[in-house]
């Protein structure tokens, strides 16, 4: 669902943080889980469509901006990429890495290197053009200018063995014939899943919150909920998206989410800052790609489970979209596992933590809105949740400050000129553009007080205009996914699902306290 997501760096960091916390409290000692994971007048006019995003202007039009030689450097061969790799993973971290270079070059567009790189990943070219403001970042989604072939996590691509030897839809450019088949198939299964989506979500949320309540009653320090949340997400998505209910397989029901955790982690280790003791992390985790055989057994179990229990969806892929059985199952596993399960596993703890840790009165405002809209017998459904402006704004603001996809990539189809807010630069054919979303979404030219969490930022007419510049789904929030672009097929389902989770929370509870890893207390609705 979070198509083209590369949310995993935050996913692994979150798991590591939660695991440390749980170990220190002796809550889950036996869990050896590797993963943890302007005012209206001042705004530029919105982009007219998702395929012509570069026409948006937040400064003078390109013809009036100065042409500037692109700053930055790749450094000496081997030495430059290695130095940048150590800064990125060790000495600075991703935020400071990009921010310090932007300040040094006095530009939001510059050349640099990004991991993975030398010594044992010699086939990966670490050279990138960093784009760190909303205006230049939008070029990543202009499919006339850029190619999305095999750039999910930059120039590095995990072995195709992780996907049964198939280039699944996320690795295909829009010009490749199979992209239209895979994207259309994904959009159709999402459309069909809407019939059971709400029912399965609410059913699994009931189980999740009952587990949290039980754990809180047994532990004065609260309940670590990430594992329960992942189990909830896995069961919900498997049933809603593929029709394969994990309850038919005891092994999958108990361990399916763990299998996905390992499959996800092993693919992206070379690109991910985890935060363990250096230089051990650099030596053992960032120096080479890990082989598929480490998770081959688990992946085969997941493949067999989908193949045996998702018959209707598999027939749909074959009869209506011309996909082979293998292509259908591997694409389903990627959409469900990498995009949806992985994305929600990162985003939902951020959302729950933001609400549970708030002391500004936000919970009372959310509770009031939810109960007002759901009152008078209306209940909670897609229609009523769409009327909850504050709830939706909180979802959008969390996505802005904590995008589950930190990095977005695209390769220049030909030479072209790229505009930031204050200059124009020349990009050469074949160069890899890289946008670091946590900085892009803090663009002060677009967002007032960009570092602050403002729950009602996207409320009202002025707030709705800002949705043109909210990029988390491989395109703007106002964009429309289609076979001609790479925008997340489930862009709208993601945000409405998150809103449903908030609404369900405040129908169940008057108040909760906690953070992104644990719930301390819950006060049941009165």
Describe each model-derived feature in a short phrase.
Residues 34-35, 39-163:
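N-terminal membrane-proximal hinge/A-helix region immediately C-terminal to the signal-anchor transmembrane segment
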Residues 61-69, 74, 112-115, 148-205, ...:
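Cytochrome P450
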């Amino acid at each position: 669902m979070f198509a083209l997501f590369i949310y995993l760096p935050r996913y692994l960091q979150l798991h590591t943080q939660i695991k440390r916390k749980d170990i220190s409290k002796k809550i889950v000692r036996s869990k050896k889980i590797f993963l943890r994971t302007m005012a209206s007048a001042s705004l530029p006019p919105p982009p007219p469509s998702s395929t012509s995003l570069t026409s948006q202007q937040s400064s003078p039009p390109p013809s009036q901006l100065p042409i500037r030689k692109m700053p930055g450097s790749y450094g000496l061969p081997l030495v430059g990429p290695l130095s940048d790799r150590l800064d990125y993973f060790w000495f600075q971290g991703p935020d400071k890495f990009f921010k310090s270079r932007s300040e040094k070059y006095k530009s939001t567009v510059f050349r640099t290197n990004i991991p993975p790189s030398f010594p044992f990943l010699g086939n990966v070219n670490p050279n990138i053009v960093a784009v760190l403001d909303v205006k230049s970042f939008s070029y990543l989604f202009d499919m006339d200018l850029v190619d999305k072939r095999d750039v999910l996590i930059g120039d590095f691509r995990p072995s195709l063995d992780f996907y049964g030897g198939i280039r699944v839809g996320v690795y295909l450019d829009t010009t490749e014939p199979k992209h239209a088949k895979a994207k259309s198939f994904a959009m159709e299964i999402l459309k069909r899943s809407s019939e059971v989506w709400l029912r399965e979500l609410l059913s699994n949320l009931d189980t999740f919150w009952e587990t949290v309540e039980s754990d809180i009653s047994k532990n004065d320090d609260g309940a670590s909920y990430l594992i329960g949340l992942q189990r909830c997400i896995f069961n919900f998505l498997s049933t809603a998206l593929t029709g394969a209910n994990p309850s038919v397989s005891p092994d999958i029901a108990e361990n399916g989410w763990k299998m996905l955790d390992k499959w996800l982690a092993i693919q992206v280790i070379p690109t991910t800052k985890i935060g363990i003791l250096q230089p051990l992390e650099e030596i053992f985790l960032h120096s080479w790609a890990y082989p598929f055989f480490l998770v081959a057994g688990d992946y085969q179990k997941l493949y067999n489970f989908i193949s045996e229990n998702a018959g209707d969806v598999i027939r749909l892929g074959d009869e209506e979209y011309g996909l082979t059985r293998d292509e259908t199952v591997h694409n389903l596993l990627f959409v469900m596992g990498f995009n949806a399960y992985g994305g929600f596993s990162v985003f939902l703890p951020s959302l729950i933590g933001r609400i549970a840790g708030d002391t500004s009165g936000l919970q009372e405002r959310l509770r009031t809105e939810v109960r007002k809209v759901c009152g008078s017998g209306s209940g909670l459904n897609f229609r009523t949740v769409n009327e909850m402006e504050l709830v939706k704004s909180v979802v959008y603001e969390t996505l802005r400050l904590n995008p589950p996809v930190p990095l977005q990539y695209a390769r220049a189809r030909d030479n072209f000129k790229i505009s930031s807010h204050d200059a124009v630069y020349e990009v050469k054919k074949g160069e890899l553009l890289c946008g670091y979303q946590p900085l892009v979404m803090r663009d002060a030219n677009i967002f007032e007080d960009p570092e602050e969490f403002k729950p009602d930022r996207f409320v009202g007419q002025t707030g709705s205009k800002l949705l043109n510049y909210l990029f988390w789904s491989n395109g703007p929030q106002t964009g429309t996914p289609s076979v001609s672009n790479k925008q997340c097929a489930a862009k709208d389902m993601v945000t409405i699902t998150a809103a449903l989770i908030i609404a369900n929370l405040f129908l169940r509870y008057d108040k909760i306290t906690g953070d992104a890893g644990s719930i301390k207390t819950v006060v049941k609705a009165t």
